[in-house]
């Protein structure tokens, strides 16, 4: 049977202390979780708060299996990269359109930017108030490969590549590509 309980507090403390010692050397922290308990919420909160205090970019993704998962638990991050299903699970909403859905997720999670993965339909880009014009931006980019042979790891690749773009101060379109 699959165990989905959080890792024990002593191991959480070891992970956090390791990050704490090295945080000044970091430009980016990626949080990626399959919701099996490794990233307990207390640990996630501590890592996010530490990153914010040290001006380290933090980006997150989550793999939701069955009915388990809540991508919004990665609050106040620079970038979230959920699937439509993960976003719907997080805000418990199966009815609203994509723009309403992603804005509700952005408000709940307080994420600065969201790249909503739409599978064969591409990506929905959504960002909160841009500093320059105080507008919310939403756009869609279609798929680059219309006939993929193997999609294993595609979401992980998107998380890593878009997170590195965030570090290089790319705009939202550069980040999405």
Segments predicted by a language model, with ranges:
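Glycine/threonine-rich flexible loop motifs
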Residues: 36-42, 90-92
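Non-cysteine beta-strand/loop elements that form the S-adenosyl-L-methionine
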Residues: 76-85
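Active-site beta-loop-alpha junctions enriched in small/polar residues
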Residues: 2, 34, 63-65, 85
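Conserved N-terminal subdomain of the carbohydrate kinase-like
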Residues: 1-30
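Residue-level signal for inorganic ion chemistry
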Residues: 29-32, 83
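Active-site donor-binding loop signature of nucleotide-sugar glycosyltransferases
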Residues: 2, 82, 141-144
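Conserved phosphate-binding/catalytic region of the ribokinase-like
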Residues: 14, 25, 32, 42-57, ...
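Core Rossmann-like FAD-binding/catalytic domain of the broad FAD-dependent monooxygenase superfamily
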Residues: 22, 87-88
